[in-house]
């Protein structure tokens, strides 16, 4: 993603509504290097702190900011200990946010990466789709299906479900509200309430 940031520069569009590549780079840097400020995403009382720190970081030279973020969290930063697990999906989604907004299509991944994506999707789909009004059955190509929002076992008993199929990476994007995801959808799409990342 670092190379793509550098290639496109700070003013390229992203799929994150209203955000440019600079805004996304600032978000990623703050999230990984200033967890005290990043908490403002979830804790309303800290949102002012997040905005202040984000404005300060946004003033940095874009290429230096991207390179700094690309090196990962500082050694003493507690985020470093959960970096791979915490960032795998977020970095994938945000990388695609940049790619898709700039005319690039889906990428091909190895079987190992697809399996890793599937493992994360199994965990995250339950959270990302928890507000759905019908069960959501996701069928990643070549991998076991994933059922989310099946509050009453309906997915096993009936057909009042939403079915989504496609490559596992596309299902991750779709689960997190990215309409650019290349998936096939059957059923009431409005019943599948997706999260954002």
Pin down the residues of each PLM region.
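Soluble acyl-CoA-dependent acyltransferase catalytic core bearing the H(X)4D motif
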Residues: 2-5, 53-57
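Short, contiguous, pocket-lining structural segments
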Residues: 16-20, 57, 83-86, 163
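An N-terminal domain-cap segment
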Residues: 1-31, 35-40
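Structured surface interface patches that mediate subunit assembly and partner/cofactor docking
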Residues: 7-11, 34-49, 64-197
